A protein has these predicted regions:
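C-terminal motif of bacterial Sec signal peptides marking the signal peptidase cleavage site
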Residues: 20-24
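Bacterial signal peptide processing site
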Residues: 26-29
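Extracytoplasmic small-molecule ligand-binding "clamshell" domains
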Residues: 34-136
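Bilobed "Venus flytrap"/periplasmic-binding protein-like clamshell domains
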Residues: 79-82, 93-106, 138, 156-214, ...
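Acidic, polar ligand-binding/catalytic clefts
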Residues: 111-173
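A ligand-binding cleft/hinge motif common to bilobed small-molecule-binding domains
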Residues: 138-145, 193-195, 223-256
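Periplasmic-binding protein-like
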Residues: 155-162, 238, 242-280, 297-312
């Protein structure tokens, strides 16, 4: 994802937005209902430490020699996408993806280095060798699988959110002529383009798609009523609702559920299989469930099997 405009009205920003703006996300969200706590969990759960993960020598042996020798995995991500990846009030990079990435690295006997970047440029940076993994709430789709390998780790969909009370009576079925905020590079951009085409084909006005570089800017647009609504991953929308104290609210149910994927540059031997094996091991030993609970992600999106290129 990525946006074109940054706003200076910091007094209006809740802590989650301020955190994202101090540094520089993919699409997803739950595709179905669930009974778990709202995205973001509680302050107590977010401060909980995830137990260290034991190294798996067999998986570690599958890591490329250059990465193993360096002792760390350089991970590209857009740190404006709470609760998945963001910067907290202490300036620390945190989130669901961060904790899972750390656990994956530990399983391979490595550490992590997270590098912040605009979402729309992360996969290109991965291909250019700038990163050794890309983990930033990327939805797995056929277009991305043409250029990278991807390991699934959570199933998410898209949610529609509006200012409190839905003053413009926005609904997913009628976005024609409306100002809808979205992060650049996300699957929601493509979704809105298709919906806008349907509008104009039926003689209605096109959707005014307002694209921004960071998800925090998208959230602020809706919170301050500069935009009439936004589309984003449902865990992210749920978190925005929680962190704004209800200044933003969800309309309808999440839709178009699809798996998030960890992106790996193609043609790196068994490296992708090592990542897949590490994620599966974390699912099997319960670490994955603990990370989901810490960040309050809906368990309906939890996977029992990590797959390599599941749509290929």
């Amino acid at each position: 994802m990525a946006r074109a405009t940054h706003f200076k009205a910091l007094a209006l920003l809740p802590a989650f937005a301020l955190a994202g703006l101090t540094m520089a996300c993919g699409a997803g969200g739950d595709g179905s209902g669930g009974t778990s706590q709202p995205a973001g969990g509680t302050a107590a759960s977010q401060s909980a430490e995830i137990p260290a993960v034991a190294k798996d020598p067999a998986l570690a042996a599958m890591v490329p020699q250059a990465i193993a020798a360096d002792g760390k995995i350089v991970v590209g991500q857009d740190q404006s996408y709470a609760p998945n990846e963001f910067v907290d009030e202490q300036g620390k990079v945190v989130g669901f993806d961060v904790d899972l990435g750390n656990a994956i690295a530990q399983k391979l006997g490595l550490t992590t280095e997270y590098q912040n970047a605009a979402f729309s440029g992360i996969l290109a940076g991965l291909g250019a060798g700038q990163y050794e993994l890309a983990m930033s709430s990327f939805t797995i789709n056929s277009e991305r699988l043409q250029t990278v390998d991807m390991v699934s780790y959570y199933s998410a969909g898209t949610s529609l959110a509006v200012p409190k009370g839905n003053p413009d009576k926005i609904s997913l079925d009628d976005l024609c002529g409306k100002n809808i905020a979205v992060q650049q590079g996300t699957v929601q951009v493509d979704d809105l383009a298709a919906r806008s085409q349907q509008c104009t084909s039926s003689g209605k006005p096109a959707i005014n798609v307002q694209q921004f570089q960071q998800q925090t800017d998208v959230n602020l647009q809706v919170q301050t009523k500069r935009s009439q609504a936004m589309l984003a991953d449902s865990p992210v929308v749920d978190y925005a609702v929680k962190q704004t104290g209800g200044a933003v609210e969800v309309v309808g149910e999440p839709y178009d559920a699809a798996p998030y994927g960890i992106a790996i540059k193609k043609d790196q031997g068994s490296y992708a299989q090592a990542i897949q094996g590490a994620v599966q091991a974390l699912i099997d030993d319960g670490t994955y469930a603990k990370i989901l609970a810490k960040w309050g992600l809906n368990t309906s999106g939890a996977l029992t099997k990590a797959e390599l290129n599941p749509q290929s």
